[in-house]
Amino acid sequence: MQTEHTAELNLLWGTLILEELARLGVKHVCMAPGSRSTPLTLAAAKQSKLSQHIHFDERGLGFMALGLAKASQAPVAIITTSGTAVANLYPAIIEAWLTHVPLIVLSGDRPPELIDCGANQAIIQPAIFAQYAKQLNLPTPDLNIAPQALLSLLDDAVCNQSQPVHINCMYREPLYPNEPSVDFSRYLAPIAKWQQQTKPYSQFATMNSGQMPTSDALARFVHGKGVIVAATLAPEQQSEELIVLAQKLGWPIVTDAQSQLRQHGGAIGNIDQLLQQPKSKALLAQAEKVLVFGGRILSKRLISYLNDQDWKDYWQVLPQQQRLDPSNKPKQVWIAPAHQFAALAWPRSSQANWALNLVQFNDELETLYQQQIDHAEFGEAQAIRAIAKRQTNEQQLFIGNSLPIRLYDMFAPITTSSANVFTNRGASGIDGLLATACGVAIAGAKPTTLIIGDISALHDLNSLAIARTVTSPFVIVILNNDGGNIFNLLPVPNEQLRSDYYRLSHGLEFGFGAAMFGLAYNQVDSLSDFIESYEYAMTYSGPSVIEVTVAQNQASEQIAQISSWVKQS
């Protein structure tokens, strides 16, 4: 057991850990205050390669890290103290695991002799995230454990990981160094070369076999009537290449809200509504082949279509191997970047332009939305369409769960440009949406809009403290329909149950919440006021809140009315 210079050795190990993580591609570190994580915090504070983000609430901290990792396309480190501080990261870790976002949790912990004996703030932390994180348990720092062993352990745990890693770091007291300097040169001698370099201690490279379909396989697959489905695709997956592929094959491409193509004029974006239109359903029923890029499709109608259709060939393209098909259809899964797969030497389909009428049907729905949403009573769909029309490819749009993402999926306009779209649709929770959007805004450093419901905003109100650290334009649009009105769309047995146990009307407004955190705030109840407030906010350097006040049943009644028209068209 190491007893001499304990605090200094703790700090040395923390310094080695943070330095190696920086070399492994970590650019951001998110920290919550705490004593047991002091060796990590002090090391991070002096690590110039890492941007530091501090927040008092570990749940929000985890989601901020998630947003930072999404937008920066790089792993993000999170430092917490021991106890329930670690447990508060769990929702963000689950979301990151399901959506393949690399987060690295560094949790301070009590030493073994203080676990399970009634010691303060001590819980069993190893494997706290169960199957949702790769686990590395470090011993208490000890001069008998070589520094190269520590670095090798880190490299093996973190390198090339696309999902969360939990590194549990046990520290004995004292935690705060008192001596100005301790000579560890003999201890560090084996890694002297590493200290002089900038590369990780160990490096791992995977040789890709590059197995792709042959030209004969491509020719056989495109023989017949087919559909391309653009499901969830991250901005870096260059989904525009899928439009080029669709034009080359002569097949329609239908798009999910998370595909980066929902507003594209060359795509069939209104697929959710078209699948309840008799003439569109009849046309789509002729399809024999399907090529799906990504997974986690939002529209239940599109999911049902893929499940119910008797496909001759079902191909799915994913960036990494995983099961992303609830229908469990027999299929060929190709592991490849979407844009690379789309750029293969595809021949034109033998049934090119077989579904050309879908383009007309899609355009007709856009005309219907202009008439029945844009020029109708002010409401949530109208606000979302107004936001979507004002996006450019130099902006970011984070869409919250529950009703906002569904309204965007159903009613987004056809436009010539659109923002990079971000969501949390792994576990699809309403927690941490504001914090995640803050991370996206900070890492992206571009004008960013968050569309979020009132219950989701209340759930993550603490994260307005993170929002005030954003320096680029960051507009938080809260759609306040006074409760969880997504349940208006679900078959709850009666209205009293819906009101008492599901909707949970609260009668709250967000003005004082914004004021508490010093954020600019506007409350609007008309389209003209909303557009004026939103366009101004997008020129404002920093965060602002726009609260859109609407009637409880406005969105659900509008959805039902439009659905009725579509079914009869």
Swiss-Prot record:
**Care to name a GO molecular-function term for this sequence?**
manganese ion binding
Question: What biological processes does GO assign it?
Answer: menaquinone biosynthetic process
The organism's superkingdom is given as Bacteria
Please state the Enzyme Commission number of this protein: 2.2.1.9
- What keywords were assigned to this record? Magnesium, Manganese, Menaquinone biosynthesis, Metal-binding, Thiamine pyrophosphate, Transferase
Q: What pathway annotation does it carry?
A: Quinol/quinone metabolism; 1,4-dihydroxy-2-naphthoate biosynthesis; 1,4-dihydroxy-2-naphthoate from chorismate: step 2/7; Quinol/quinone metabolism; menaquinone biosynthesis
Which cofactors are reported in the record for this sequence?
Answer: Mg(2+); Mn(2+); thiamine diphosphate
Catalysis: reaction(s): isochorismate + 2-oxoglutarate + H(+) = 5-enolpyruvoyl-6-hydroxy-2-succinyl-cyclohex-3-ene-1-carboxylate + CO2
Q: Is the keyword Isomerase assigned to this protein? A: no
Cofactor binding: number and manner: Binds 1 thiamine pyrophosphate per subunit.
Subunit info? Homodimer.
Q: Which NCBIfam families match?
A: menD
**Main function:** Catalyzes the thiamine diphosphate-dependent decarboxylation of 2-oxoglutarate and the subsequent addition of the resulting succinic semialdehyde-thiamine pyrophosphate anion to isochorismate to yield 2-succinyl-5-enolpyruvyl-6-hydroxy-3-cyclohexene-1-carboxylate (SEPHCHC).
The UniProt similarity line reads: Belongs to the TPP enzyme family. MenD subfamily.
Name of the protein in question = 2-succinyl-5-enolpyruvyl-6-hydroxy-3-cyclohexene-1-carboxylate synthase
- Origin species: Shewanella halifaxensis (strain HAW-EB4)
Q: What is the lineage of its organism?
A: Bacteria, Pseudomonadati, Pseudomonadota, Gammaproteobacteria, Alteromonadales
